Amino acid sequence: MRIKKLLTTMVLSVSMVMALTACGSGAKETDSSAEEKKVLKVGMECMNAPYNWSQTDDSNGAVKISGSDEYVNGYDVMIAKKIAEENGYELEISKIEWDGLIMAVQSDNINAIIAGMSATDERKESVDFSSNYYEATHVVIVRSDNAFADAKTLDDLAGCSATSQQGTTMYDSSIDQIKDVDKLEALPDIPSLIVAVDSGRVDVGIVEKPMALAAIATNPDLKMIEFEDGKGFDVDEGITSIAVAVKKGNSDILNACNKTLDAMTKEEKDELMEKAISIQPATDSE
């Protein structure tokens, strides 16, 4: 009888140990899986077509904006999705005003800026940049019936009124190259700039070529002026180089971005940009 009780006790003890071991193993697996979960937290304006814009549904591959009922789509979103998918990251996109993007990545609220941002020397003092994911020349948008609509060189714009988006190289540098320019106050975003030009409040707006193509595609009264080499804006290569910005020293995200971007051809990037322009909404929803 004593032996039977002893055997029963031993069996129960072994069962408990096995159960505890299994629970411990499950907890470790759960912890390990949580540790392995990687999230690419991207910041962008969500109102800078064709790079990025907000919309009300997930059509054409749009991504839900974190903390919002809206979705975001555009060239930047396509690039972000490609980087995330090819490097095993979940993608999370936050809507952040342009002037707050660098601060957001520095404070770890996001870990990447994919927002049509050019890799200028000044910005390189604050963040690290990936390889380029687009080359964007500076061009002019103007109403077709404006006095400066037939400009062929920068000199032909002499005396015009001009503006661009605040905090951009177009406003800080390119506009000043126009002789006798009436430089108006910078505008907060591209939709505001398009409205200003279309309404005649300003003669010309200086933007990157993709944004100009997007603007004229949805605003029939506007035209784009792209000057021939040597006849337009003198812009450093770094200013036209669009890249992903990350917090200084964040080599994991930077290497992941470069792995994907370095493998992309110019043709692939151009195709994505053409797709973004073709699916953009008539107006950004703000």
Segments predicted by a language model, with ranges:
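C-terminal motif of bacterial Sec signal peptides marking the signal peptidase cleavage site
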Residues: 18-22
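Ligand-binding clefts/hinges and TM-proximal coupling segments of bilobed small-molecule sensing domains
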Residues: 25-29, 169-185, 224, 256-286
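Flexible hinge/capping segments at coil-to-helix
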Residues: 31-32, 60-62, 144-161
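Extracytoplasmic small-molecule ligand-binding "clamshell" domains
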Residues: 34-117
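Short helix-initiation/N-cap motifs at beta->coil->alpha
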Residues: 75, 92-105, 149, 184-199, ...
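Acidic, polar ligand-binding/catalytic clefts
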Residues: 85, 90-156, 235-237
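A ligand-binding cleft/hinge motif common to bilobed small-molecule-binding domains
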Residues: 100, 116-126, 173-176, 203-238
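Periplasmic-binding protein-like
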Residues: 135-142, 218-261, 279-286
